A protein has these predicted regions:
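Beta1/beta-strand and adjacent pyrophosphate-binding region of the FAD-binding site
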Residues: 16-33, 186-196
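Glycine-rich dinucleotide-binding loop and its adjacent helix/turn
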Residues: 5-12, 65, 157-212, 216, ...
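Flexible, glycine-rich terminal cap/loop adjacent to redox cofactors
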Residues: 28-33, 39-54, 59, 66, ...
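FAD-site-proximal beta/loop scaffold in flavoenzymes
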Residues: 170-186, 270-346, 432-436, 447
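Short hydrophobic core segments
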Residues: 26-28, 133, 148-158, 192-193, ...
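Glycine-rich flavin
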Residues: 2-23, 39-46, 51-186, 219-223, ...
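A conserved FAD-binding loop/helix module that cradles the flavin
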Residues: 226-233, 320-376, 453-476
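Glycine-centered short loops/turns at secondary-structure junctions
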Residues: 45, 210-212, 242, 440
Length: 494
């Protein structure tokens, strides 16, 4: 679906390192983690060979972040046009041309692709080769028919969509987040298996583009890892878009009949569909790496085991990105890859910070979060929850988008340990909270920073101010402020 289709061939560099018997760093995998690690190490002056079996750019460019957000942009535009009458703007006959939508998606990929191309890597000083790399020992790997030696190696092969062994599912030719971009036409009836971020995003997108969508999630609710109130708002939005949500349901079998394909549910229900999208999680791509020969271990789920410095059981081999089992986001892969590259080629001892990795679900409304959620703030937790509903945020009122909130989770000293923001462009309001959580800032620090008005950032600001005001009414603080007022009155009465 792009200018560089899967399976394309591109020129490879020599596998022999210049002026040495071994490469300073061998990078296996050319997605976000591999690209960032390779460029970082080359920037430090190391000799770097990156080996990619298919296309550089990885899932984010070709089948993940870029195409999905382009598709969502088109879908949200259709929804906004249909809803324009609420603002006094009538848009008659909103029609979706799915072929043109997919052309727009391809254009987005084509625009971003040069940044992640082999040419861009070479310009950064990285040697690039196309092929399958397999570890053959603690410091050697086979690339095609050649043996390559390395002083350090970094594994960055990512993860792939998992397809559950549901009887009959394979017969229905299921789509995944990797393959859905090859759809020849808009599905009339789409079944989405999985109610996580990917399922919710793509389910809403196809519903807004005109498909009849049914989402089936085994957990009791969608977005089970997020704040329950946030999940409820997204669920309500999906239902308003015409999506049928079946939470707490499991598909036991797929059969075919006169009406099309049919998903049989454990509760006795059925869902008839034409196409099925599987979005139930991802599995690491490690089967072809030869990990056992290099002394690299994996956990019970198959993810490469790393320490806090992203070092594997082989101290000369590092790993970054989705195959480590850390939160599977492009930004995580990039930050961790840079860290691992510095540790590998410079001997640094930097450690990862998993607690403050931001996450965003790009539905309408968006859900942006970091750290712990309100569900962790039980009576014995010592945590405090401060929430501003967007009915109190003037920008949300002006835009008619008050179905949302900004929520801070604070420890006993008022330090930010988590946050959830729901609303338009919620992810854009999150960075200041991530910074606060990472550096131990307190609600009073956020309250003291002037926020532009009117913005959705007002939600976080008001939540932090709310906490400060609560603190001012604590008995100890109240005694201090009363004493200061008394002193001030006496001074003014002189």
């Amino acid at each position: 679906m792009s200018a560089s289709p899967a399976g394309s061939v591109w020129d490879s560099d020599e596998l022999a390192p210049p002026g040495s018997a071994v490469w300073d760093l061998l990078v296996i995998g050319g997605g976000t983690a591999g690209i960032v690690a390779a460029k970082t190490a080359a920037g430090f002056g190391a000799s770097v060979l990156l080996v990619e079996r298919d296309r550089t750019g990885g899932d984010c460019l070709w089948t993940g972040c870029v195409p999905s957000k382009a598709l969502l942009t088109a879908a949200h535009a259709a929804a906004d046009a249909r809803a324009a009458s609420r603002y006094g703007v009538d848009v008659a006959g909103v029609e979706v041309d799915f072929t043109r939508v997919m052309t727009y998606v391809r254009q987005a990929i084509t625009t971003v692709q040069p940044t992640d191309s082999p040419a861009a890597l070479r310009e950064a000083g990285v040697h690039v080769a196309q092929g399958v790399a397999r570890l053959t020992g603690p410091r050697t790997a086979q690339v095609g028919t050649d043996l390559v030696g390395f002083a350090q190696a970094l594994l960055a092969t990512g993860a792939a969509p998992a397809v559950p062994p549901i009887p009959g599912l394979a017969d229905a030719s299921p789509w995944t987040s990797e393959t859905i971009w090859s759809l020849p036409a808009r599905p009339t009836r789409l079944l989405v298996l999985g109610g996580g971020s990917i399922g919710c995003e793509l389910g809403q997108a196809f519903a807004r583009l005109g498909s009849a969508v049914t989402m089936v999630e085994a957990e009791p609710r969608l977005l089970s890892r997020e704040d329950a109130d946030a999940a409820a708002l997204v669920t309500a939005a999906l239902i308003a878009d015409g999506v049928t949500v079946r939470a707490g349901a499991a598909v036991t079998a797929i059969t075919s009949g006169l009406m099309g394909w049919c998903a049989e549910l454990a509760d006795g229900g059925e869902v008839v569909f034409d196409e099925v999208l599987v979005a139930v999680g991802r599995s690491p791509r490690t089967t072809e790496l030869g990990l056992d020969r290099a002394g690299v271990t994996v956990n019970e789920r198959g993810f490469v085991q790393v320490n806090s410095r992203l070092q594997t059981a082989n101290p000369r081999i590092w790993a970054a990105g989705d195959l480590t089992g850390h939160p599977q986001f492009t930004h995580t892969a990039g930050v961790h890859a840079s860290l691992a590259a510095g540790n590998a080629v410079l001997g640094l001892r930097r450690t990862v910070d998993v607690a403050t990795i931001p996450r965003v679900t790009f539905t309408q409304p968006e859900v942006a979060a970091v750290g712990v959620s309100a569900e962790h703030a039980g009576p014995q937790s010592g945590l405090t929850v401060r929430t501003t509903q967007h009915t109190e945020v003037d920008r949300a009122i002006a835009e008619g988008a008050v179905a949302g909130f900004s929520r801070l989770i604070l420890d006993g000293k008022g330090r930010v340990v988590g946050a959830t923001i729901v609303g338009p462009r919620a992810g854009e309001s999150l960075p200041e909270v991530v910074l606060a959580a990472r550096h131990g800032l307190r609600a009073r620090n956020l309250a003291a920073a002037t926020h532009a008005y009117p913005t959705y950032g007002d939600g976080v600001w008001k939540a932090s101010i709310d906490h400060v005001q609560h603190q001012l009414h604590q008995p100890g603080v109240h005694r201090v402020t009363s004493a200061l007022r008394t002193v001030r009155r006496r001074w003014l009465a002189r």
